């Protein structure tokens, strides 16, 4: 069974360019080296932020590639954990990770540090560099 992962939007964005040191994150997803877990809310944020930071066309292509991938798991979380108070918008990633029983969330966002202090839900958060090291060690 593949490792289930939730990617924060900025980590996904940082991995899209083939010239990026983080490109392996996107490439390994496309090659099925892990399963990307997403919800409709997460896909909407991917679309919005990538369109804003890159172009609407790139955003559409990225979201289409995710939706059509064999290595994506669509999660419909019927509950909200409200684990992050500093930025409630980040809770969609926590809810998705918890519902998917994901190994971790990949994020550079310090708001996710709040998860370290919670007894429940237990959701591991990796920084992008740590996730890259994880991918390298799996080879």
Predicted regions and their residues:
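Extended, non-globular alpha-helical segments
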Residues: 40-67, 134-139
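Extreme N-terminal starter segment of soluble prokaryotic enzymes
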Residues: 2-4
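Alpha-helix capping/helix-boundary segments
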Residues: 11-12, 42, 111-112
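PIN/NYN-family metal-dependent endoribonuclease catalytic core
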Residues: 7, 17-19, 23-51
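Active-site neighborhoods of divalent-metal-dependent phosphate/nucleic-acid chemistry enzymes
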Residues: 72-105, 110, 114
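Acidic, PIN/NYN-like endoribonuclease modules and their adjacent C-terminal/linker elements
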Residues: 110-139
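A secondary-structure boundary/capping signal
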Residues: 8-9, 38-39, 108, 127
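Hydrophobic/aromatic ligand-binding patch that stacks against planar heteroaromatic rings
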Residues: 28, 66, 96, 117
């Amino acid at each position: 069974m593949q490792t289930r992962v939730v990617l924060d939007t900025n980590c996904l964005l940082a991995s899209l360019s083939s010239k990026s040191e983080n490109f392996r994150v996107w490439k390994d997803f496309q090659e099925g080296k892990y399963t990307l877990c997403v919800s409709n809310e997460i896909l909407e944020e991917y679309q919005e932020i990538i369109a804003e930071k890159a172009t609407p066309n790139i955003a559409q292509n990225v979201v289409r590639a995710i939706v059509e991938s064999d290595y994506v798991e669509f999660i419909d979380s019927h509950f909200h954990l409200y684990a992050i108070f500093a930025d409630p918008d980040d809770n969609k990633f926590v809810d998705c990770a918890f519902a998917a029983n994901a190994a971790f969330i990949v994020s550079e966002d310090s708001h996710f540090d709040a998860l370290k202090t919670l007894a429940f839900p237990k959701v591991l958060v990796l920084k992008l560099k740590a996730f890259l090291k994880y991918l390298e060690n799996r080879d």
